[in-house]
Amino acid sequence: MSKVDVDLGDLLAKVLPTGVKVTIRHISSAPTPCTALFTPPPGEESESTFCENHFLTVSVNADEHDGPEIIVFGIEVLVYSTAHLTTVFVSKADSTGFLHLLKNAPKVSLIRRISNGFLSFLVQTHQRPGVRLVVSLFARAQNQYLFPGSIENSGKHVLDDRGLIKWWCRVVDPILREYEPESGSHEKGLLDRAMESAKSSATAFLIVPGCDKFETRGFFPGTAKSDDKERPRWLNSYPLHQLCDNTDAPPRCLVPRFPDDPKTRFLLDLDDELPQKLEAAGSKEGAGQWRSVKSLDQFWEMMSFRQECSAGRLVGFLWLVINPPGLVNSVQMTSSRPVFKEKAEGSLTTTVPVYDKVDSKPTGTAVSVSTDSQSSDTAKDSTAEATSGGPVQDPSTQTGSLSSETHPKVQPNTDQNAFYWPEAGRGHAVMSEEDYKTAINFLLEQDFYNEKVSIASTKAWSEKVASIVDQLWVGQQVTGRNTSGESADKHAPTTNIINTGLVRKRKKDEPSQATTATSAQKEGCEGNGTVSTAVTAEASTTGTNESPGVNVLQANLIRKKKKA
């Protein structure tokens, strides 16, 4: 649920060290219909998708006493919304190299804390009841993204590919820690499901093409080492079941297509292998299938041979899946996309989505297309791309043949709408998509190769934004008030509260829990070797504040030590 009381300035003040003064400018656009992120399976049309643009710049005073402003950091985030999924995609982030002008600059990473605060703000304000949210980004090292000429500044520190992947994992990790963990197993009992679905839960996923599982774990933040192996917070895998409603669809339908994304360029190249309409019409099995890549695992394996992911460079793809209360990772996405009768009868044709020219130059925003008036009320993690004409079948008549037996699906919610625009999540300046592009293009035309030019460019940018929205000044001044060395948004883990109706009463002739727990510590838990602190299930309902972060074990899970 959207937290309407969240303020971006207040959130950043909590994570910035005490006394640090910055000026932020957050501009955003109204949600507009856009190309869906996922290509629809043959015989289905794409789901209704809206895109909302957000751009944040952070400035400091060049002199100690209210000197001219100079931009030190910028980040662009695209928020895609469908009826049953919200995707927060980090498009671009860049610095100018002038952060050293901040007097008495602390040693902590201000850029990392600001990035974390901005993403946390968008996540909190865009959460919807019963709708899964995913933060998605790809980490690719590059000299400059947003500020032309900034690479010439000696104060700009450009991370290498490995350092950048680790940096983004550390940015996302505090957001992950705000939510409960989940069990890594899909074979969960009633007690596990009740505990995990009682609160919002989250899991992070990371894939680095060309790296095996052992190498990928080296990119995880340090906090991952202390996570329970039975309830991991970081996984080296792709969240297929959390993002896709039909895991049996062709691989091209299972990967989202973001602007200026290495995956998108590879997908478009593979689409050249699609069979022609005449060939596809005679074979249902070959519809929507590439000739070379036949599975999703093969797609990720081939990604490591792409020029952007090879030649000594690594690219990290990161997803943070946040499940609202009532959903867990094992609950698979579902879709109410209409299925066309004409195509369902056998004349399956494959449509290739139409994109703007995709090259190595950042595109900035998603492609806008016109959509039908009819709404499709369920979504994949992202959505589909091409639309087709023809009679539409009622979504309620669709069968569940596409569902996975091992992954229960989210029930369609016909009351949901793909359009979502929370007031609390809007920027200091709200623009139309056209005005937003004008403002971003104006910034990309400026120069930031030295301090004097950067000050002039910052002034021109701020005046341009104010003129577009017809205001004298746009922005907010923020003063940090975090006195601790750690980020203020890190929450201590809390003990899970078990529903008392699910707690099994201990028989009188059983030994006490404390004695059993002690023996279990000595002997070890089955399949794990060691056991940390154990408490009774009954005590967890009343003593949640005494021992935060402890593991709660049921009596039937603890083995009795054999007598010598």
Swiss-Prot record:
Q: Which segments show compositional bias classed as Low complexity?
A: 366-377, 529-544
Q: Name one GO biological process term.
A: regulation of DNA-templated transcription
Q: Name the Enzyme Commission number(s) assigned to this protein.
A: 2.3.1.48
Give the primary localization class. Answer: nucleus
Please provide one cellular component term from the Gene Ontology annotations of this protein: vacuole
Keyword Transferase belongs to the record: yes
Tell me the superkingdom of the source.
Eukaryota
Phenotype of the disruptant? Severely decreases acetylation of 'Lys-56' and 'Lys-9' of histone H3. Increases mycelial branching. Severely decreases spore formation and abolishes sclerotia production. Decreases aflatoxin production. Increases sensitivity to sodium chloride (osmotic stress), hydrogen peroxide (oxidative stress), methyl methane sulfonate (genotoxic stress), and Congo Red (cell wall stress). Decreases cell population growth rate. Decreases virulence on maize seed.
Provide any one GO MF term from the record: histone H3K56 acetyltransferase activity
Q: What is this protein called?
A: Histone acetyltransferase rtt109
The protein's organism comes out as Aspergillus flavus
Taxonomic lineage is: Eukaryota, Fungi, Dikarya, Ascomycota, Pezizomycotina
Gene responsible for this protein: rtt109
